[in-house]
């Protein structure tokens, strides 16, 4: 005959979601409005409590009915799509400048609205004369030019190290299906534009 072993069932642990349904509803609403307003193919948002790390909302503009085969087969774009983090990278770079002692937040730089290096021109998102900004002012104004100037002595290896310390190019640990770790190339492959815009 066949031998079988029977193992008694045990109660599982409680699972508590950190999603706030009101925040989730509002985020979905804003995403649909933004998608329509800007003619975007889709939109995503993640709202996180910065103190606890809890995810309060994780949404994309796609309409998929929960529990359906489509929902099971389609991971959320909020975790599966790779995208450029944009000006969030300025905060990461700035933390590296400060930790390495390259700058203090009170250091001042004369920042024009554009700069050209090796035939490539980089601009701020708004026109302005040459401004005397502290590093805090550069961050406040989200100045691309100011960040390039402040990062002139910031080694690529250190830049890469800080990006990885902040989780760029790595999975989040949410363990959601289809999660992408993103893309972060080795600094040995960076060209000037990558270095200045990463």
Outline where the language-model segments fall.
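Extracytoplasmic/periplasmic proteins that interact with beta-lactams or build/remodel peptidoglycan
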Residues: 1-44, 64-67
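Beta-lactam-recognizing serine transpeptidase/beta-lactamase-like catalytic domain environment
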Residues: 2-6, 19, 45, 49-85, ...
């Amino acid at each position: 005959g066949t031998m079988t072993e029977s193992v008694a069932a045990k109660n599982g642990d409680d699972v508590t979601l950190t999603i706030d349904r009101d925040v989730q509803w509002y985020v979905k609403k804003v995403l649909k409005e933004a998608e329509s307003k800007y003619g975007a193919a889709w939109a995503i948002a993640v709202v996180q409590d910065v103190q606890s790390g809890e995810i309060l909302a994780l949404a994309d503009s796609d309409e998929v009915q929960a529990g359906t085969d489509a929902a099971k087969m389609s991971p959320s774009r909020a975790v599966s799509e790779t995208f450029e983090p944009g000006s969030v990278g300025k905060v990461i770079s700035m933390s590296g400048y400060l930790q390495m002692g390259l700058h203090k937040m009170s250091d001042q730089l004369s920042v024009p609205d554009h700069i050209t290096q090796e035939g490539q021109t980089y601009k701020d998102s708004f026109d302005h004369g040459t401004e005397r900004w502290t590093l805090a002012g550069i961050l406040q104004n989200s100045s691309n030019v100011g960040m390039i100037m402040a990062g002139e002595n910031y080694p690529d290896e250190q830049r890469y190290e800080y990006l990885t310390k902040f989780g760029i190019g790595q999975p989040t640990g949410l363990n959601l299906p289809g999660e992408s770790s993103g893309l972060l190339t080795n600094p040995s492959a960076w060209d000037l534009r990558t270095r200045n815009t990463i």
